[in-house]
Amino acid sequence: LKCSGFFKTVIYLPNLIMASAFSMLFYTIFSDVGPINNLLNSMGLPTYRFLAEVAGARGLIALMNFLMWFGNTTIVLMAGIMGIDTGIMEAARIDGASSFQIFRKITLPIIKPIMAYTLVTSLIGGIQMFDVPQILTNGNGNPDRTSMTAIMYLNKHLYSKNYGMAGALSVILFIITAVLSIFVFKYVTKDMVDTGAKTSKKAKK
């Protein structure tokens, strides 16, 4: 790909920005007197309190996490795709396979281990999310604690010296993370295991 190094750098740049800086930037932009609401007012629309609405606060948190980690996930997947032997693609095209068929039958199965890795790490990162909602909502999880995460609850119990509850939350969080990670990993790599088992049986015969 032409200029692939440049595009990789541009895509990865948001990942280098600290979560605290990202949160403060979004807090300023989407505040009641921020540039987004000023633009809405100039268009004759009422002020939308992003941080006071459940959909607004959750949407901003989701958008920030997407922007911060999109680059990292893209680079990992691109590395997996670029590592595929081009000879396999050329052979498939010669056999008359379409681009969609090549992607579905060749590219996707080959990068499944990488997809499993990205899904599991994204899942763990989502469960352990703390810095963005903590800073954006000033640690309160507003509105009405709908933006509270498990780690924010854990942090509150630690600061209130309720160490028993904090320890219990840590264990529960670990179990949930482990179970979900194993489920996602096995679900994504299921076809690979089945294919490998069938191949080994044929080889023995």
Regions found by a protein language model. Name each.
Residues 1-205:
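A structural signal for multi-pass alpha-helical bundles of membrane permease subunits
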